[in-house]
């Protein structure tokens, strides 16, 4: 197997296959669940709006892939600084049956100099999650500066985040290798690689992209660090490219490119 094919297979099993569009329907989510199951393995998870969790759970169970995890989003996509609303949404997501919650960090508050609200929001959302994985989206493409990206990453980790995630996919600039490196370095430098994972989201579209991101993680955190507990790709159009690279002809219904 070529290096690119090996990376493609690795990436497929780390995907949070995503549809987070305003026109999402039960039918689109059912189709997404079908796409999560491929001839070469399943994606790690799907990522959907909370209201679709029950239909997704049913579909995944019926197609024999109940192990595909269901991630959902809260405080999404704007990352407001209302802790009460973020926590209420997170509690509701847990009640719906989410396996994982991707919450948006109040990044604009941090840009305005407020470090406390982000810490408190993440801390309370993690308390609401209990054992459920909490991924925190810091919106790197809006923070832009290394100092802010590293500070947001540190705050999230100190507040109990299980993962730090680059982006919502809803702003002009999403995951980039430059931002990914900054966040991976924080995980390394804080000594939390055992407990904290990383998720680039938006803009990872090809097997070559995925291979480069994985090589970077191997370089910074070691060859054995990347697994589904420590690394995810938030993507939709990536799956088709990975399957093409692997020469698997599964028909994939492509949600709007993410």
UniProtKB/Swiss-Prot annotation:
Gene3D superfamilies: Aldolase class I. Its EC number is 4.1.2.4. Its main location: cytoplasm. One of its GO terms (biological process) is carbohydrate catabolic process. One of its GO terms (molecular function) is deoxyribose-phosphate aldolase activity. The active site is at 102 (proton donor/acceptor), 165 (schiff-base intermediate with acetaldehyde), 199 (proton donor/acceptor). Coiled coil: none annotated. It catalyses: 2-deoxy-D-ribose 5-phosphate = D-glyceraldehyde 3-phosphate + acetaldehyde. Pfam families: DeoC (PF01791). Keywords: Cytoplasm, Lyase, Schiff base. It comes from the Bacteria. SMART domains: DeoC. It is found in: Cytoplasm. It is an enzyme of class 4 (lyase). GO terms for cellular component: cytoplasm. Pathway: Carbohydrate degradation; 2-deoxy-D-ribose 1-phosphate degradation; D-glyceraldehyde 3-phosphate and acetaldehyde from 2-deoxy-alpha-D-ribose 1-phosphate: step 2/2. InterPro entries: Aldolase_TIM (IPR013785), DeoC (IPR011343), DeoC/FbaB/LacD_aldolase (IPR002915), DeoC_typeII (IPR023649). NCBIfam families: deoC (TIGR00126). Catalyzes a reversible aldol reaction between acetaldehyde and D-glyceraldehyde 3-phosphate to generate 2-deoxy-D-ribose 5-phosphate. Belongs to the DeoC/FbaB aldolase family. DeoC type 2 subfamily. This is Deoxyribose-phosphate aldolase. It comes from Vibrio campbellii (strain ATCC BAA-1116). The gene is deoC.
